Amino acid sequence: MDFSYEVENYMYNIKNKPDIFGEQRILDENDNICGYEEKLLINATMLDLESAVKLARKYNAFVCPAHIDKQSNGIIGILGTFPEQPEFDYAEISDIAKTEQLKQNYMNLANCSFICNSDAHYLWDIHEADNYILLHDEPYSSDIIRKELFKKLMQKE
C-alpha cells in the first residue's frame, strides 16, 4: 500500500464524474462492492516515464509498458518512438506477429522480450489461448499465481 500512497501524491486531484466515466468501484477479495473511488483514475500522473519506473522499482515492482504497438495509449503512439531510457526487460504487445518488425524499427527493443495480451476489458473480448503461460497454481490462491507469474517472467528465454 505504500506504493499506492506515494503514487497518489503525483495524481491530479480531479473528481470522477460517474455519469461520464463510469463508477470506480472498490471491491473486496470476494468482488463485493465496499466503496467507490472519488478521484478520477484515468488521468495521467505528474510523473514522467523515467520517474514512474524509478518509483515502481523502488518497491520491487515488475515494470512492463502495455500495448506498445497500439496507436491509442501505446508508448510508441504517444511518444512517436520507443524510448532508450529507461530500459525494459519486457513489453506487452497485442499482436505477437509484430515482434520482429518492432525489434527492427526500434533497436532498443532488440533485447526485450514480449508478452502478448488481448487487453480485453470484457470476457467476450478475450481471444483464443494462442499465447499463454502455464503456471503452477495448486493449492489455488492469487498469491501463488502472482508469484509463479513473476518467477516465470524473470526466467528470460
Per-segment meaning from a language model:
Residues 1-89, 97, 107, 145:
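Extended substrate/RNA-proximal surfaces in nucleic-acid metabolism proteins
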Residues 68, 95, 118-120:
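Active-site metal-binding loops of divalent metal-dependent hydrolases
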Residues 73-80, 124-137:
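Histidine/acidic-residue-rich catalytic or RNA/ligand-binding cores of hydrolases
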Residues 83-90, 109-114, 131-134:
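Glycine-enriched alpha-helix->loop->beta-strand junction motifs that scaffold or abut catalytic
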Residues 96-102, 126:
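Acidic/histidine-rich catalytic cores of soluble enzymes
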Residues 102-109:
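Short, aromatic/basic amphipathic alpha-helical patches
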Residues 112-128:
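Short acidic/histidine-rich active-site segments
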Residues 137-157:
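Mid-to-C-terminal alpha-helical segments outside catalytic/metal-binding sites
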